[in-house]
From Swiss-Prot:
It catalyses: 2-formamido-N(1)-(5-O-phospho-beta-D-ribosyl)acetamidine + ATP = 5-amino-1-(5-phospho-beta-D-ribosyl)imidazole + ADP + phosphate + H(+). HAMAP family: AIRS. It is an enzyme of class 6 (ligase). Pathway: Purine metabolism; IMP biosynthesis via de novo pathway; 5-amino-1-(5-phospho-D-ribosyl)imidazole from N(2)-formyl-N(1)-(5-phospho-D-ribosyl)glycinamide: step 2/2. GO terms for cellular component: cytosol. This is Phosphoribosylformylglycinamidine cyclo-ligase. GO terms for biological process: 'de novo' IMP biosynthetic process; adenine biosynthetic process. InterPro entries: PurM-like_C_dom, PurM-like_C_sf, PurM-like_N, PurM-like_N_sf, PurM_cligase.
Amino acid sequence: MANKNAYAQSGVDVEAGYEVVERIKKHVARTERAGVMGALGGFGGMFDLSKTGVKEPVLISGTDGVGTKLMLAIKYDKHDTIGQDCVAMCVNDIIAAGAEPLYFLDYVATGKNEPAKLEQVVAGVAEGCVQAGAALIGGETAEMPGMYGEDDYDLAGFAVGVAEKSQIIDGSKVVEGDVLLGLASSGIHSNGYSLVRRVFADYTGEEVLPELEGKKLKEVLLEPTRIYVKAVLPLIKEELVNGIAHITGGGFIENVPRMFADDLAAEIDESKVPVLPIFKALEKYGQIKHEEMFEIFNMGVGLMLAVSPENVERVKELLDEAVYEIGRIVKKENESVIIK
């Protein structure tokens, strides 16, 4: 008992940690899928790859966090969707390589274990996993007094997926003449928030700006990142997509060239980009140069596909949502991305 009291006096609440584990079990259970072995709480999560039915499996992994969007979740005391952001950032990256997400692990570090709040965070992670078809097979909650303030926490995630070796998407199939199709984003997603916070530093979040179509600012800023897995997987299975770009930090300019060879470029018709109201507000209130917006944000397109012209109609048919023909692949002359 003396040791327990000593640890508690140093700021670590072991009992609260146990409570967190008990609270999250029901959320983790929602994510179970074929291949999961063992139960939550072991030293390592286990997954039986043979259950996927993939003949020549290649594992593809990704890790990410949600950046300073967390600071807005803390500021507005809304923690139930930030976990979905974390999952989205990881699984959208690996789907861009052709991988079906299999499982996910999360890492939460906090200054003080608050079981109710941490349950909300993990519930959001679980919801993201359900949307991605990934099992939440493990994680870590680290209470680190002195490292973080009592109300602060950080969140990171790790996704592992599998692809058929012949269906890996690595940019080698993208050719001149391919059509660029944009899939809508849900909002800012999880990048550019250091700038977003500066632009809206003097706002409470309760404001309904005229550009935001009746929504409160805080609702728009914390809109969870869209997860594209279930929309895009059927396209990968039918081998209809030559390249995929997840539009994250660096916007169009940094991310689109990652899906094709150095001798190619993306020519984008700006008038076809479905720019969301929040980006118009950011440009206006932040006095950001228009061309710079495309270097920072997704501008309304969270995922971009390079598709052979003869496959465009089939892709649209399978997606069953608004699909934006925003450009094409051309031979590179100077820039890798040309926005007209």
